[in-house]
Swiss-Prot record:
GO terms for biological process: eukaryotic translation initiation factor 2 complex assembly. It comes from Vanderwaltozyma polyspora (strain ATCC 22028 / DSM 70294 / BCRC 21397 / CBS 2163 / NBRC 10782 / NRRL Y-8283 / UCD 57-17) (Kluyveromyces polysporus). GO terms for cellular component: cytoplasm. InterPro entries: CDC123 (IPR009772). The keyword Nucleotide-binding applies. This is Translation initiation factor eIF2 assembly protein.
Amino acid sequence: MNTDYTPLVNVPIKREDIETCRFSNWYPLFKKHCPTAEIIGPLPAEFIEYLEQDGIKIPNENRSFYSEDLTINDDNEYSDWDNEDDDEEEDKVIQQEVKKEIDPLADFPELHRQIKDVITKYGAVAPKMNWSAPKDATWILPNNTMKCNEINEVYLLLNASNYIAHDLQHAFDECEDIEDQKKSSDFELVLRKWFDINPALEFRIFIKDNEILGISQRDLNYYDYLEPLVDKFRDLIEDFIDDEILDRFPLKSFVIDLYIPRPFNKVFLIDINPFARMTDPLMFSWSELLTKNEPVTPIGQEEDYEFRLIKENNVGRFACKEHSENQVPTDIVEASLNPEAIRELTQKWKELLSKQSMEEDSSSDSNEE
């Protein structure tokens, strides 16, 4: 049996291309088309270590939802009860671990103050780093969004996000200029003024050599009112890219995220991403985008690219929340904020395993009889 296989198409990318897509490099060019934001950087090394460490130490801020029930004992540990009766050996281990943790108030107080000032200025913010936003970590906040009303929510989101970890550790892994991969990079924290986005009205546009390869709905759920608006969206997107982006952005190949809110008379620039496999192709595949049989038509002329929308209600899709693969039980989240809770969770886990083992042994004995 003969089977045709589509060869994996290489997507060459250089470090310079990825750096060009850094928020601080394109935001000044298109500021009037973007949500209001402030950039803090370069970030101190202690802050990067803080985000990379296992677990996170939450500052005991006044009026903070995340520390109001915690008290500081003589060992400077956060706990909701005294540990006088705890095992001394375990206490010594925990104390050593706590001392190793980075404390924002002690290790980067100036950055801590800057973040608080921006939150006070805007009321609420949505954080991101050089390239990525912690969309995969919204499960850790009570509102299940990236809306941060206080500084501890910023810390929790960034620390829990795999996307942020990728920015810090693997941003240049796909670069073909291998030597440049080893160069260090300055990191920055972006705090966007919070505004509500209707996820149905955000679109991802793939551009290669200044030509549109395809447009994809950003949120992969079905919205029945989108399809009748496709022609309007297409015109707005093409005009915006042709008039505002192509002549000002230095790269010819990139991926851009745009938001078109009602009444559909303005386009917001949300993000610019590298034209590389690290960027999610959403309703396309990278091989599909790169192996089109016919050349695409320049922007402004009759289009021959696809504008892809979810065409029908997918019950299975709605049952699976976006980024659910990154979510964990709330017990684990709470335990990560408190060494005492970690001990309690571990003990419960051991008890469950012991109970399961006893039940299996009992079942085995019954079968033998």
